[in-house]
Amino acid sequence: MNECMEIDKPLITIVMAVYEPNMQWLKEQLLSLEAQTYPNLELIIRDDCSPTVPFEQICECAATCIRSFPYEISRNERNVGSNQTFEWLTQQARGEYIAYCDQDDVWLSEKIETLYQAVLSQNAVMSYCDMAVIDAKSDVIATSLRQIRPRLEYLTGSALMKSYFFRNCTAGCSM
């Protein structure tokens, strides 16, 4: 890999709010983040005061899975919900771009690189992608979210920005 190229790429912060995570799914997601091809990442995880999953268990899972980029984990003092937790995470992000991450996703290894390249090639401020839908055993049940939500409309350009203030069309896969 070209070291000079890596240095030139901006930092992308992955933010993840967790609450009562299924630890196997969280591990799979963290391993998929570890496998990202984009070279300049950081991860910030915030536990929304999970009552039955020990915070230490979440910390141990991250320590086991994340080895190639910096990460930090913290915990809310009380449960405030995902919106406020993601708001806090967004404020803490140091990257030029922010990738929002759900605790039960599994990302393809080139996801962040692909979204970053889309931002560059389109001179965009935001990018998002479709997703395959998997079941509890990680078997693909739909190769596109549109197979499950046929009324879902993907928007681009000025149509996206105008509509984004009124509704979310990104399904969480955004940067």
Spell out what each predicted region is.
Residues 2-175:
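Nucleotide-sugar donor-binding/catalytic module of glycosyltransferases
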